């Protein structure tokens, strides 16, 4: 079936700080991932790998945080958000994500 907001979970390490700081993010991010899924992730770009799974990334607008960029993986109708940051420039975001994941891309 289609992925919906209820199928979106958050990995503690890369999300907790942002979710605590900006209360509306949990709902906004889950809704954004659902919307992206309905569009076939057309607006998402690749962003490396996490635990052997391909990551996608996109921007999410939030009332509390302004804009954030997220990285998430999708598998079997479920999504896991791995990282949330206010770093919006894609190149800088990827560098920051690489550092977070602890694996440099050549």
Predicted region positions:
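Arg/Lys-rich, positively charged N-terminal/basic patches that mediate binding to nucleic acids
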Residues: 1-34, 106
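An acidic, glycine-rich, mixed-charge low-complexity segment common to nucleic-acid enzymes
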Residues: 1-9, 43-48, 57, 77, ...
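A short acidic, often aromatic-flanked loop/helix-cap motif at beta-alpha or helix-coil junctions
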Residues: 11-18, 50-51, 68, 90
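Helix-centric, low-specificity signal for extended rod-like, repetitive segments
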Residues: 19-21, 52, 62, 83
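Positively charged, low-complexity intrinsically disordered regions
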Residues: 27, 46, 91-92
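A short, surface-exposed loop/turn module that caps and links secondary-structure elements
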Residues: 34-63
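Enriched for short, Lys/Arg-rich terminal
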Residues: 58-106
């Amino acid at each position: 079936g289609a992925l919906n907001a209820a199928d979106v979970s958050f990995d503690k390490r890369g999300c907790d700080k942002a979710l605590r700081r900006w209360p509306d993010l949990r709902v906004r991010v889950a809704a954004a991932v659902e919307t992206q899924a309905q569009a076939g992730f057309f607006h998402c770009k690749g962003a490396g790998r996490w635990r052997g799974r391909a990551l996608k990334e996109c921007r999410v607008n939030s009332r509390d945080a302004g804009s954030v960029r997220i990285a998430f993986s999708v598998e079997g109708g479920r999504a896991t958000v791995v990282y949330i940051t206010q770093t919006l420039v894609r190149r800088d975001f990827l560098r920051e994500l690489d550092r977070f994941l602890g694996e440099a891309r050549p």
